[in-house]
Regions:
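Active-site helix of classical SDR
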Residues: 164, 200
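Substrate-binding pocket helix/loop in short-chain dehydrogenase/reductase
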Residues: 139-141, 145-150
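Conserved glycine-rich Rossmann-like NAD(P)H-binding loop of the short-chain dehydrogenase/reductase
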Residues: 65-82
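Conserved glycine-rich cofactor-binding loop
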Residues: 51-52
Length: 323
């Protein structure tokens, strides 16, 4: 009987493994089939890092869902470019451009929050999408210059937290608010070659999960998004051999991010394989996950230095410059 049951379970196991292999998000995220448009329509959504990459694509998709948008980044000209490309009920004419440097200090951030809260009559910020981040080319943990270390922490952690602290009181007065935090797979598992960036994302994950636990009963929600390698305008994913690393498109990442936010998911993972599998292993079998990272860590740093594929499974078998 036991043998018969095993054979009966094989098709189910095959389907599960096939799903995991083909999926570009975690199981909970993949179970949500569509964006809940009613959660977005006519809502005020503030996006940092909106001048390029995932932030730009999020702006385009949210505008098409009839959201009221506030776009922030340091480059005002690029924000205007993005604004002029948007279409929707409120776009482009009613899209607000709000230049912002997360490392500019509390007074500057407070001024930005006050402006964001006043842009739309009788409507404050409903969604705050923390997308802005500072990331340097891959290097060893010991080779990060002090300037890059400070910039990473100031923007990814301190500036993001300060902006949140200044915005939350407005949300609490309304009894609602939702933070969507663009974290990283590097905030879930070790990221050899990205030690400081990884540290900043682990910090952000810890802060925002704690914030949600403290304020959820008061109407404040948090969705943490952990993407793996994404194909953005600032990163073409090409190796020195001219071969492209496997990266998920910005459009797909943005789409799944909006799905996660509108379904009020707590944390989601978005990535192609093998990074998604590594995240599962790190979450549910951490000892194995650390063993894997220890096995490939040094080779991954060397692959980055040589222009190789830093996401190739071949690194596990000693191929430093895997294609």
């Amino acid at each position: 009987m036991a043998v018969l049951l095993c054979f009966m379970c094989l098709p189910l196991l095959f389907l599960v493994f096939a799903f995991l292999f083909l999926a570009d998000g975690d199981l909970t995220l993949m179970s949500k089939r569509r964006v809940k448009r009613e959660e977005i329509k006519d809502k005020v959504i503030w996006i940092t890092g909106a001048s390029r990459g995932i932030g730009e694509v999020l702006a385009k998709q949210l505008a098409s869902l009839d959201a009221k948008l506030i776009l922030s980044a340091r480059n005002e000209a690029e924000l205007e470019r993005v604004k002029n490309q948007l279409t929707g009920k409120y776009a482009p004419n009613e899209v607000k451009v709000l230049p912002l440097d997360l490392a500019s200090g509390e007074d500057s951030l407070r001024d930005a929050v006050n402006k964001a809260e006043s842009f739309f009559p009788d409507a404050g910020v409903d969604y705050m999408i923390h997308n802005a981040a500072f990331e340097r080319p891959k290097s060893t943990a010991l080779d990060v210059a002090e300037e890059a270390l400070k910039a990473t922490i100031n923007i990814n952690v301190l500036g993001t937290i300060s902006l949140t602290q200044l915005l939350v009181p407005f949300m609490l007065r309304r009894g609602r608010g939702h933070f969507v935090v663009m974290s990283s797979a590097a905030g879930k598992v070790p990221a050899p070659g990205q030690a400081v960036y990884s540290a900043s994302k682990f910090a952000v994950n810890g802060y925002f999960h704690s914030l949600r636990s403290e304020l959820y009963q008061k109407g404040i929600d948090v969705t943490i998004v952990c993407p793996g390698p994404i194909d953005t305008s600032g990163s073409n994913g090409m190796t020195s051999a001219g071969k492209k690393e496997k990266r998920l498109s910005s459009e797909r990442c943005a789409e799944l991010t909006i799905v996660a936010a509108t379904h009020h998911l707590k944390e989601v993972w978005i990535s192609d394989q093998p990074v998604l599998a590594v995240m599962y292993i790190g979450q549910y079998m951490p000892t194995v996950g650390y063993w894997l990272m220890d096995k490939v860590g040094g080779k991954r740093v060397e692959a980055a230095a040589q222009g190789g594929n830093t996401y190739s499974p071949g690194l596990l078998f000693g191929n430093k410059k895997a294609n």
